[in-house]
């Protein structure tokens, strides 16, 4: 099966301030990943990282899906996001409360950010799973206020909030669970037993996670062929209208 990897980052060297797109593409080849959503969470600046991802997606439109990292603390965030989305390349944005040290409830620009994503048909990916700033429940009010915007919980609540994340996704048809970095089989078993199969998106977490391990963990769950097809390909294709 040709996999769609919903979550990865572009490798970056702080010492040389360079990105390693070749390593990312080789990893895709090694793991039968046909399409990969990529963001540049680590970069000298947010703008430089996003521009690099934009250019990478332009060079490899059949392999790379672009996700823009957004820092909602910045005073020009709405204008900046408007300019990015008007390029027509970015399929998603990534909001990381741990990386940028914020609580969603304190960021008054987020309503406009969600509005813009809804207007452009762009998905909002949010980092969850490690510490109080990354609680999945902090995003539910924004989802309720913006009924045209889809939300993805990256790492599916992680080690801190995995069980609670399942409960938050259950009543909504606009919240999805992305799987990278979550290897706790009891949480995964509960999630697959409780949630509709179309709510799951496979993510590798590359390069901080090993792509093969992110794929092989699902061998332990004894998923049906239809569940695997949905997880590894069909759900991302439907969400992103590929």
Feature locations, PLM:
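Mid-to-C-terminal alpha-helical segments outside catalytic/metal-binding sites
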Residues: 1-6, 18-35, 197-199, 212-242
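Acidic-and-aromatic substrate-binding clefts and catalytic sites of carbohydrate-active enzymes
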Residues: 12-19, 40-48, 70-77, 100-107, ...
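Active-site gating/metal-coordination segments in enzymes
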Residues: 47-123, 171
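Catalytic pocket-lining loop regions of alpha/beta-barrel enzymes
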Residues: 91, 104-201
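Histidine-centered divalent metal-coordination motifs
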Residues: 4-11, 127, 155
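Divalent metal-dependent hydrolysis catalytic cores, especially in the metallo-beta-lactamase
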Residues: 8-9, 22-44, 64-71, 91-92, ...
């Amino acid at each position: 099966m040709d996999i769609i990897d919903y979550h990865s980052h572009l490798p970056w060297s702080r010492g040389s301030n360079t990105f390693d797109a070749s390593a990312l593409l080789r990893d895709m080849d090694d793991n039968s990943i046909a399409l990969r959503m990529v963001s540049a969470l680590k970069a000298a600046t947010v703008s430089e990282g996003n521009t690099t991802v934009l250019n990478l997606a332009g060079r490899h439109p059949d392999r790379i899906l672009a996700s823009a990292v957004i820092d909602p603390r910045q005073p020009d965030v709405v204008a900046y996001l408007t300019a990015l989305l008007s390029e027509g390349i970015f399929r998603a944005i990534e909001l990381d409360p741990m990386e940028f040290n914020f609580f969603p409830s304190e960021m008054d620009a987020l309503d406009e950010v969600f509005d813009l994503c809804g207007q452009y048909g762009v998905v909002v990916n949010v980092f969850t799973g490690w510490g109080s700033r990354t609680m999945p429940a902090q995003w539910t009010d924004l989802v309720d206020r913006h009924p045209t915007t889809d939300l993805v919980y990256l790492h599916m609540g992680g080690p801190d909030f995995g069980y609670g994340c399942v409960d938050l996704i259950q009543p909504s048809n606009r919240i999805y669970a992305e799987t990278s970095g979550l290897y706790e089989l009891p949480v995964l078993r509960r999630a697959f037993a409780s949630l509709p199969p179309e709510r799951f998106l496979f993510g590798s977490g590359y390069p901080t996670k090993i792509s093969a391990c992110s794929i092989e963990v699902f061998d332990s769950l004894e998923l049906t062929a239809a569940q695997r097809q949905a997880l590894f390909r069909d759900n991302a294709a439907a969400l992103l209208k590929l």
